Regions:
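N-terminal Sec-pathway targeting helices
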Residues: 2-16
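Intrinsically disordered, low-complexity regions enriched in serine, threonine, proline
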Residues: 5, 25-27, 47
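Glycan-processing catalytic domains of CAZymes
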Residues: 9, 35-307
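Hydrophobic membrane-insertion alpha-helices, especially the h-region
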Residues: 13-25
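Hydrophobic single-pass membrane-insertion segments
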Residues: 26-34
Length: 307
């Protein structure tokens, strides 16, 4: 045995352990930095006529094998890529929201010419509900993203009659992305109020929903175009961030009640997420059947089938 190498190996192991410990402390401190919103609440949404066709419902990050269970829970939309075999696999009684977008400032799933071909192919397909053009675009960091969304939304409007364009927003600048500026039909708002730890705490920051709705109001996004994004994920088993926990059943009821106050008859309602995402979402709604996790599936089934 080469004893001369032992101190060097021990030092390397120690350095590795310290690095791992530092990363875990960073994640803990990052989560602990979250301050609950204590500003003004958003005004209640109008309780006017229900959207034509009622509220459509989708749980994101699904596979074809999930469709029977999703349909049983009352979801009528699935997210798929603009692929002929995937679109053809959308079950009867459901439609697809086609993911063709980008995340924040990243490249788009499809270049513009490829996007045009996809719209030409699926723009009149009855299995297609609409087009998911961007996930959390950040015009503060990449101002050009607004122009790209605008030309894609305009192309959908011209060549996909009856189908919708959709983007999902977070708490980044919204004003460059309003319907008046980019022509998008529907806007997901994704405040995730159960934040600050990957382990469940007594309270979620329900006011975060009001904060983001007020941001959208101020920017000029009409409530009638808002699609609530419901938090159906945590991060206790994710490999990346540890900032969010899966809401308890009572906390989830509180989330639903707040959204019902602010957007009582939305055209679209989104559950994020059904499927696990290694870095960002674990556990998710697919896990939330009771036992070790809250039974959020039963709550969503009752909600989806009653509205």
């Amino acid at each position: 045995m080469d004893v001369q190498g032992v101190p060097r190996k021990v030092s390397a192991i120690t350095a590795t352990l310290l690095a791992v410990l530092g990363f875990l402390l960073y994640l803990r401190d990052r989560a602990a930095d979250h301050e609950p919103y204590d500003g003004p609440l958003a005004s209640p949404g109008a309780t006017g006529a229900r959207s034509p066709g009622g509220t459509r419902r989708i749980a994101l990050n699904t596979e074809p094998s999930d469709y029977p269970r999703l349909k049983e829970l009352g979801y009528d939309l699935v997210d798929v890529k603009a692929d002929a075999s995937l679109v053809a696999g959308v079950p009867q009684g459901m439609q697809g929201l086609l993911w063709v977008g980008n995340f924040t400032c990243d490249d788009f799933e499809l270049g513009f010419e490829e996007f045009q071909r996809a719209v030409q192919r699926f723009g009149r397909d009855p299995k297609v509900y609409g087009w998911y053009l961007s996930d959390e675009p950040n015009p503060g960091e990449c101002p050009e993203i607004a122009n790209e969304i605008r030309r894609r939304a305009a192309y959908v409007e011209r060549h996909a009659p009856g189908q919708i364009s959709f983007i999902s927003l977070t708490d980044w600048p919204m004003k460059p992305l309003t319907p008046e500026r980019v022509g998008v039909d529907l806007y997901g708002l994704d405040p995730y109020p159960c934040r600050g730890s990957s382990k469940a705490r007594e309270r979620c920051d329900i006011g975060a929903i009001d904060r983001m709705v007020r941001m959208a109001d101020t920017a000029g996004i009409p409530r009638a175009r808002v699609a609530p994004v419901l938090q159906t994920f945590g991060q206790s088993c994710s490999s990346g961030d540890k900032q969010y926990w899966l809401p308890t059943e009572d906390q989830f009821r509180e989330i639903l009640a707040r959204w019902d106050r602010l957007a009582p008859r939305p055209p679209l309602e989104i559950s994020y997420s059904w499927g696990r995402q290694d870095k960002w979402a674990c556990p998710t709604l697919s896990d939330a059947t009771g036992g070790p996790h809250p039974d959020l599936q039963s709550l969503m089934k009752a909600r989806n089938r009653s509205r």
